[in-house]
């Protein structure tokens, strides 16, 4: 993991298309601004984990439903 120190209004560049800027520092919170192409999905980590878990659960349900339908058509 790369660890960087940035002050307010400073930024980091990821590749050619993504820039992350420190907008504000308020107590224990840091506000970040992210400039990226619209084709890049950006989520808070906890939201991304929830989406991934829900997709995995849906895939299991779909697989079970498909197996059920196959067994009942035979």
Swiss-Prot record:
Keywords: Bacterial flagellum biogenesis, Cytoplasm, Repressor, RNA-binding, Translation regulation
Coiled coil: none
GO cellular component terms, A-Z: cytosol
InterPro entries: CsrA, CsrA_sf
UniProt-listed Gene3D superfamilies: Translational regulator CsrA (2.60.40.4380)
Gene Ontology BP term (one): regulation of carbohydrate metabolic process
A GO molecular function held by the record: mRNA 5'-UTR binding
Subcellular location: Cytoplasm
Primary location recorded for the protein, binned into one broad class: cytoplasm
Function as written in the Swiss-Prot or TrEMBL entry: A translational regulator that binds mRNA to regulate translation initiation and/or mRNA stability. Usually binds in the 5'-UTR at or near the Shine-Dalgarno sequence preventing ribosome-binding, thus repressing translation. Its main target seems to be the major flagellin gene, while its function is anatagonized by FliW.
NCBIfam families for this protein: csrA, PRK01712.1
Quaternary state and interactors: Homodimer; the beta-strands of each monomer intercalate to form a hydrophobic core, while the alpha-helices form wings that extend away from the core.
Family: Belongs to the CsrA/RsmA family.
Designated name of the protein: Translational regulator CsrA
Taxonomic lineage of the native organism: Bacteria, Bacillati, Bacillota, Bacilli, Bacillales
Gene designation per UniProt: csrA
């Amino acid at each position: 993991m790369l660890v960087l120190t940035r002050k307010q209004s400073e930024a980091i560049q990821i590749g050619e298309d993504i820039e992350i800027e420190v907008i504000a520092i308020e107590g224990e919170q840091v506000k970040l601004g992210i400039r990226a192409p619209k084709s890049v999905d950006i989520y808070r980590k906890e939201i991304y984990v929830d989406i991934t878990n829900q997709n995995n659960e849906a895939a299991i349900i779909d697989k079970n439903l498909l197996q059920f339908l196959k067994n009942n058509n035979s």
